[in-house]
A protein has these predicted regions:
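Short, flexible loop segments at the rims of nucleotide/cofactor-binding pockets, characterized by
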Residues: 93-95, 141-142
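Short, conserved clusters of charged catalytic residues that mark active-site
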Residues: 8, 48, 59, 98-102, ...
């Protein structure tokens, strides 16, 4: 290579190299800015969903403070307990059910619960709004003794409790429960009122995808790293089940 070509090559390298470096730095800066923007958006979405979930459960835990004072629960349990002993198909039980059912079911509609339970002091499920297979079972010695509902009943003897999502056979889906103790006029524990949190309500919060595009989604994960809501994009592969 003669000296002219060598000089031309050198000049080209000297001229192109700064442009290449400048282009790389600009691209790197742009990529970093886009990444930072994406992470900031994700952080904002996380905080919004966190607040929505906290408000959802907070309002329901607040509602639980009034349940022991609500006569339809303590009074309902005191009515259902002796009728239950006569049998679910007995005239006594059906009469109480006809009188009390609608007043208890309304809590499903107003607060979005899946089910409402009245449980006597011995752990018998004497009433449910949904009338699934858990109605009539005993939460101490029966097939649901290790279920979330049974744990909620046991823990509620000392106060209002929340039991995390786990598979619940009678509903054929994952369920969590909130329960609170019920007492008679003398202040003696007579059983519990329990409420099954609807998975649909949690999914409705987490699967609202405004501003996420076609591939964005949020879902709830518990401390055990298991799903607490279903994936919107892949509900079969990634779900609470």
């Amino acid at each position: 290579m003669n000296i002219g070509k060598k000089l031309l090559t050198a000049f080209l390298i000297v001229g192109i190299l700064p442009l290449a470096i400048a282009g790389y730095l600009a691209l790197s800066k742009s990529t970093h800015a886009l990444s930072a923007q994406a992470f900031n958006q994700l952080s904002s979405l996380r905080e919004v969903k966190k607040l929505q979930i906290e408000n959802y459960f907070g309002s329901r835990m607040k509602m639980m403070e009034d349940i022991p004072k609500n006569l339809r629960f303590a009074g309902g349990l005191q009515s259902f307990t002796p009728a239950f002993k006569a049998g679910l198909q007995s005239p006594e039980y059906k009469a109480i059910l006809s009188k009390r059912d609608e007043g208890l079911k309304i809590f499903n509609d107003v607060f979005g619960f899946y089910d409402v339970f009245l449980i006597d002091v011995n752990g018998n499920v004497v009433y449910t709004a949904a009338k699934e297979s858990d109605l009539g079972t005993n939460l101490v010695s029966g097939p649901l003794a290790d279920s979330g509902l049974a744990h909620a009943f046991q823990k509620s003897k000392s106060g209002t409790v929340f039991v995390d999502f786990a598979w619940y056979g009678p509903s054929n889906e994952a369920a969590s429960f909130i329960a609170t103790p019920l007492k008679n006029k003398e202040g003696v524990f007579i059983g519990s009122a329990a409420f099954q949190v609807s998975l649909k309500e949690i999914n409705a919060i987490m699967q609202t995808r405004a501003g996420m595009g076609r591939t964005g989604e949020t879902y709830l994960v518990g401390p055990d790293k298991l799903m607490r809501s279903d994936s919107f994009l892949d509900p079969k592969g990634h779900s609470v089940k």
